[in-house]
Amino acid sequence: MAEPVHFDPFEEDALADPGAAYGALRAACPFHHQPAQAGRPDYYVLSDHAEIKTDVLQGGPIWSFRFGNAMKDSISDVGFKTDGAFHAAFRMVVQRGLTPSAVKAWRPKIEAIVDELVEAMLAIPEGRGDFYSLFALPLPARMMCLMLGAPEADYQNYKRWSDTLQFLTFEDPEPGSYETVLREIYPHFTTLIEQRQALLVAAGVDEPDLSHLGTVLPDDFMSRALVSRVEDRRLTHEEMLNICLAFLTGGQETTTNLIGHLLRRLLEAPERWEQLKANPSLIDNAVEESLRFDPPVLAHFRTSLSETRLHDHDIPERAKLMFSICGANRDPAVFEDPDEFRIDRPLPEARQHLSFGSGVHLCLGAPVARLEAKIALERLIERLPNLRLLGVGGRVRTWMYWGHTGLDVAWN
């Protein structure tokens, strides 16, 4: 281990400029031991891109997700927060609905929402406003509702629930506060599940399967959870709620931050915006570069299931490891000029980022997030070519998420 360095993800410098803080830690000490402090447990921080990808994310069962992806343990044997064969089978329930052709089929709906949001912006007489509230927030939130099968009109409630759950997961809440929120959310999802069960009863279907999607049942992921089988059995009610929660918390904030960061970086250096307008073929490059340079999630945690070695150091059982996505995405061994935002960075290089993870816990919603960001840029450069950045709002309150509360822009 290198010479001890000071690092605290809760300090103002790290919160305000995570790229600089996490990059400096990687450069000085790619494997760092963070002692316990302020009621937080001790943990290790790994910032080396190759080791994170090979030894942790693709390294087999040693580094477990079962104790949660936050600093403090959140033990679960349900759904996505598991490992091994059951986890693979459970993921497949959702993955079957996110094939390339299935994701492509969502394009018209994404385009319709984007067009509606752009029209609403153009109707504002002042020609300026907060890009987050007008566009970056409602687009992924409404799409999440449609994909899950929840009422699209309720997207603001879903956003509020998502923000609250993320804060309570990654910060230091009062005991029982997480459960209090779930007591508001679970009855809502249970009602939607029961509505689908009633449709099956009305149609006389005793053994539903995937063929009933789009016929007896709406073709959405809540229905998919209801008719799918894992290890030759139906999903339990708790497992179905787990899928609903995964969509609620995973399908909004990260994509909002992706779209917000992307536009901010393009507008803060107007020559980038002009470059993209002149060459729209760089849209995919710009999306991947944004994911690399400004990862919506700065880091995740894993827990060691047994004694192991990492970065030539002995690691005890049940040790907490924070793998720094933000630090790895600035690794000069992988990315040329890693501290520069370049929309013409070659795609094969830019796509080496770890912002969606890798291995068995690779983000299932990554193709949808990419598509939403791509369509957003396509429409913005076409319909709002004179976009200008006026100001950047405050930082989101959850330290593991990198995003802002607003982006003041003008388009006249």
Feature-to-residue mapping (PLM):
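Cytochrome P450
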Residues: M1-N412
